[in-house]
């Protein structure tokens, strides 16, 4: 009897562990919700997707350079409460001042930012959302895309638009380009010249055995390498798109550089953001002193909302509406429609082109709307909840046409 009891108890424990594991897996990847919605078909792309390949896009005679800086997990939430954020005192005061001094699109009447929507809440998806105005859907863990021969074969990104208009595209990141299929996407959609962790080793920017137990090399080096590259490419006769992706502020707790000043009233993760704000501010100040600056537009954005609250938003109410940082610097266009906007990652795609002085017939590309135009975004027109619900459903147009190019 005792052996039978132990035998049954073991199986009971196994069943409990399996059920707990399935519960955690579903909580992480929304498997049940995805299964539920994937049995429904959405026509959101048929109704609202504007094919950038067919759109009328006109560049000014004087083509402006673009420096596009994606900061890992940077939120408008990090502003001070008085300026529209959550913090009693801003943990990114320099970036708050940059947003104040330049063009910041806001969800309110103070400083603010934008939503990430389904398929853009992780770095690979965020890059695609920012540059192609569509989400990256599918793949457990959201980073299993290197297995595909191509990624979003029929998408038409800002990199492709710029390359087709005589620009040269560059992408610099401290991490490995192969993670999440980022390198493959950038090569196929804009033929970017990519500088990543492996490039830095191959070209002896860092030692072959360089290791700081992080995602790659640190942002201090990224900004130094970027300065060297910008000086070199600015001497060429072609306009450039130089895009960067930082890594120090990646969760969990970030990478606190040894050169950072530490505020003991802040957590380590808050100190990482505070130090990152100073580093980026210094980099922007350096750009503003360069000869190429007058003909260069700078865009600073967070890639997506922070995936964790530990060490940075632990005292935040569950219903707090977090937004992603944005600042547009040295523009050739003006607008009165910066405040009280409802917008998401997709809208940054046409808005960045407009910031360069590009004219877009209809003011929409893919699922994004040019914010400078004052035209309603899809978030404003349809509502965020409806938009996310439709993006979660199966789309024949997305799967067949956009992803696999069968259209």
In which residue ranges do the predicted regions lie?
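Transmembrane and membrane-interface helices of multi-pass
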Residues: 1-36
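A general marker of short, structured functional hotspots
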Residues: 3, 41-45, 289, 382
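Alpha-helical transmembrane signal-anchor/signal-peptide segments
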Residues: 30-48
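Solvent-exposed soluble domains appended to multi-pass membrane proteins
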Residues: 52-64, 68-407
